[in-house]
């Protein structure tokens, strides 16, 4: 985005090329980043903005010379020239972005071809599209609706916040109306103090009400602390950027930055099944932009008067300030306290693992530290680091923690990794084992999965699994396939603790 802005606003073609390279690399890092190529719309939109401003300037400058046939011809000729210049500029700017985009793709595709072969990449893309048969949250409709779902759900809070805005505007309007009938300076000053005090008090009441009603959690170890404040902030960002884009008096550079931020907030979540979390990752761009716009709003926007009726911006400023303060506190404390753990937050992180270099300096709960301490000690004693491992049981990070490379896929539990692919990869692994007697991957299972394989459903129930765990384990075709493989190749249990089981 920065490359696009510098390239367009300052006319530096090299930055446009760099922006194209960045977008191309983005696609290769994650295929579902493909929609971000829509950032090219910013190039075309800025070209049109420049063209419209040029036409306006032409009409203004020649209009001062008087309305004559000769002047009309000049206007027509200059507008035509401006159109030709626009098309030329659009072609050049688009060409530079496209050149950077294709350069990145060619280099990275070349690397893929050398290391793996393009057919493997194509197969991966085809698997990506076919996985929607079992992973319904990856369908295009599901991902798009998931994104809009949070915007719609958050209307519950936004409508109620709007009530505070209406109350503030009406209250200040009534005080202004009273002041228009009472001409005494002392009364006017008192009314003005009441307006400010009332607006600040209303903002405080709104913030207090939002906290009391559960708009945001005060436990900063889970996502509840920032979900709805974040969605509200994104909604405000989209509204403000649209407002500035279509404000005639806004400078073209401001329209450009507003348009780019609108695009990046809007399209980042496309292609993801994580709702609006990807867009929230762009708050480092949206937040300074919004605070800058809020500062300008407070500085330049006053009251609108119609006869004796006054619509004051004062309560709007105070209420927005209250929300921005709430948001700043929430994201600050969330960033300070949150620790990622299996897609959620975790509390009581007061222990460390002392025999694992990968986890050195990482804080976790005492229970988790005990699990990792035990398995790390066994891996160190047996010299298993560097050995291939087949991991199953929603514990993909163990491959990295223990420095044991995955035999074929570090997270075979995922719905997007279908059983047909697992069968193919395991067949290749077995062929290698048959050809090389020294090659024998370690099997690492989460304990409940291992117990189910060894002793069946009754033994699993003794461990009191949750309903979700039970649904993932019982009659799991992938797990049963791994169990058949272990039986066929004579794997035996060599390590067990409260969380993990190793078979060799």
Residues of each region from the PLM?
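Short periplasmic/luminal acceptor-recognition loop of GT-C membrane glycosyltransferases, typified by
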Residues: 332-416, 440-454, 498, 503
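Membrane-interface alpha helices of multi-pass inner-membrane proteins
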Residues: 2-3, 15-33, 38-42, 103, ...
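Perimembrane helix-loop-helix junctions
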Residues: 3-9, 23, 36-105, 110, ...
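Hydrophobic/aromatic-rich transmembrane helices and adjacent perimembrane loops
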Residues: 219-240, 271-311
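Aromatic/acidic, Gly/Pro-rich catalytic loop(s) in extracytoplasmic/lumenal soluble domains
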Residues: 233, 440-504
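Membrane-interface transmembrane helices that cradle and orient dolichyl/undecaprenyl
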Residues: 2-18, 26, 50-57, 62, ...
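Membrane-lumen/periplasm interface segments of specific transmembrane helices
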Residues: 93-176, 207-213
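Signature aromatic-anchored transmembrane alpha helix within multi-pass, membrane-resident enzymes
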Residues: 102, 202, 247-264, 298-342
């Amino acid at each position: 985005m920065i490359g696009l802005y510098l390239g367009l606003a300052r006319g530096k073609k090299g930055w446009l090329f760099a922006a194209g390279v960045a977008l191309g690399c983005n696609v290769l890092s994650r295929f579902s980043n493909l929609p971000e190529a829509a950032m090219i719309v910013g190039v075309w939109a800025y070209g049109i903005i420049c063209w419209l401003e040029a036409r306006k300037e032409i009409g203004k400058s020649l209009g001062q010379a008087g309305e004559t046939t000769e002047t009309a011809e000049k206007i027509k000729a200059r507008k035509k020239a401006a159109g030709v210049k626009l098309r030329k500029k659009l072609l050049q700017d688009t060409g530079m972005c496209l050149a950077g985009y294709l350069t990145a793709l060619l280099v990275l595709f070349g690397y893929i071809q050398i290391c793996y072969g393009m057919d493997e990449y194509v197969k991966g893309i085809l698997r990506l599209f076919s996985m929607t048969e079992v992973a319904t949250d990856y369908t295009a409709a599901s991902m798009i609706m998931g994104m809009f779902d949070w915007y719609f759900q958050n209307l519950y809070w936004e409508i109620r916040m709007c009530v505070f805005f209406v109350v503030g505007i009406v209250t200040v309007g009534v005080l202004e109306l009273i002041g228009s009938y009472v001409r005494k300076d002392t009364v006017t000053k008192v009314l003005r103090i009441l307006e400010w005090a009332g607006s600040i008090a209303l903002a405080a009441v709104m913030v207090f009400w939002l906290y009391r009603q559960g708009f945001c959690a005060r436990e900063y170890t889970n996502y509840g602390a920032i979900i709805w404040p974040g969605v509200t902030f994104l909604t405000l960002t989209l509204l403000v950027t649209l407002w500035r884009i279509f404000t005639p008096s806004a400078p073209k550079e401001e329209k450009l930055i507003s348009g780019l931020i609108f695009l990046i907030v809007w399209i980042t979540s496309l292609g993801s099944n994580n709702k609006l979390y990807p867009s929230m990752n762009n708050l480092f761009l949206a937040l300074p932009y919004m605070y800058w716009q809020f500062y300008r709003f407070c500085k330049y926007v006053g009251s609108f008067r119609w006869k004796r009726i006054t619509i004051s911006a004062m309560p709007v400023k105070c209420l927005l300030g209250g929300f921005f303060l709430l948001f700043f506190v929430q994201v600050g404390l969330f960033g300070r306290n949150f620790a990622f753990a299996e897609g959620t937050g975790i509390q009581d992180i007061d222990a460390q693992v002392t025999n694992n270099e990968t986890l050195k300096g990482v804080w976790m709960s005492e229970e988790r530290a005990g699990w990792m301490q035990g398995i790390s000690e066994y891996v160190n004693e047996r010299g298993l680091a560097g050995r291939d491992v087949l991991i199953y049981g929603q514990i993909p990070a163990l491959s990295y923690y223990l420095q044991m490379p995955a035999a074929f896929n570090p997270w075979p539990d995922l719905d997007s990794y279908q059983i047909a692919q697992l069968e193919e990869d395991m067949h290749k692994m077995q062929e290698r084992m048959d050809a090389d007697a020294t090659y024998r991957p370690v099997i690492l299972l989460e304990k409940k999965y291992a117990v189910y394989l060894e002793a069946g459903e009754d033994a699993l129930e003794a461990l009191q699994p949750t309903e979700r765990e039970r649904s993932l384990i019982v009659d799991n075709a992938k797990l049963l396939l791994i169990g058949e493989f272990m039986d066929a190749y004579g794997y035996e249990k060599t390590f067990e603790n409260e969380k993990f089981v190793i078979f060799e």
